[in-house]
């Protein structure tokens, strides 16, 4: 099983790809898709579309886990929702099953508390993937936490 975890955003889309091999979780790749603030929004969305397609074509994940988005009173809300729509469209076009998780569910599953801190999440990601140093940037660590939530749900603790 190979999973891609995705932390949606317009400026930065975090991603993390994990493979299960002999009941071990192996980190294959993690990082961010960054879009330039100087570009028009439609160009930024297209960049997410292209880069995510390339990632999926290269790594060929069989399932995906994406953070659910909750509406906040913020000027970036619509942009993030649009980026998330592009992400969901790419995954659907590749026939990849998607599981969605709220931030509280991710924190509870990974760190044992729905109110866990960023450091708690980072420590749990490092522990679960047997990493010596934290994944950078934070968006990629968040994406790995999202992927680990799905794996935990599927019984790969």
UniProtKB/Swiss-Prot annotation:
GO terms for cellular component: cytoplasm; Holliday junction resolvase complex. It is an enzyme of class 3 (hydrolase). Binds 2 Mg(2+) ion per subunit. Mg(2+) 2 binds at residue 67. Transmembrane segments: none annotated. SUPFAM superfamilies: Ribonuclease H-like. The active site is at 7, 67, 139. One of its GO terms (molecular function) is magnesium ion binding. Keywords: Cytoplasm, DNA damage, DNA recombination, DNA repair, DNA-binding, Endonuclease, Hydrolase, Magnesium, Metal-binding, Nuclease. Mg(2+) 1 binds at residues 7, 139. It is found in: Cytoplasm. It catalyses: Endonucleolytic cleavage at a junction such as a reciprocal single-stranded crossover between two homologous DNA duplexes (Holliday junction). GO terms for biological process: DNA recombination; DNA repair. Its main location: cytoplasm. Its cofactor is Mg(2+). Its EC number is 3.1.21.10. Belongs to the RuvC family. The RuvA-RuvB-RuvC complex processes Holliday junction (HJ) DNA during genetic recombination and DNA repair. Endonuclease that resolves HJ intermediates. Cleaves cruciform DNA by making single-stranded nicks across the HJ at symmetrical positions within the homologous arms, yielding a 5'-phosphate and a 3'-hydroxyl group; requires a central core of homology in the junction. The consensus cleavage sequence is 5'-(A/T)TT(C/G)-3'. Cleavage occurs on the 3'-side of the TT dinucleotide at the point of strand exchange. Homodimer which binds Holliday junction (HJ) DNA. The HJ becomes 2-fold symmetrical on binding to RuvC with unstacked arms; it has a different conformation from HJ DNA in complex with RuvA. In the full resolvosome a probable DNA-RuvA(4)-RuvB(12)-RuvC(2) complex forms which resolves the HJ. This is Crossover junction endodeoxyribonuclease RuvC. The lineage of its organism: Bacteria, Bacillati, Cyanobacteriota, Cyanophyceae, Synechococcales.
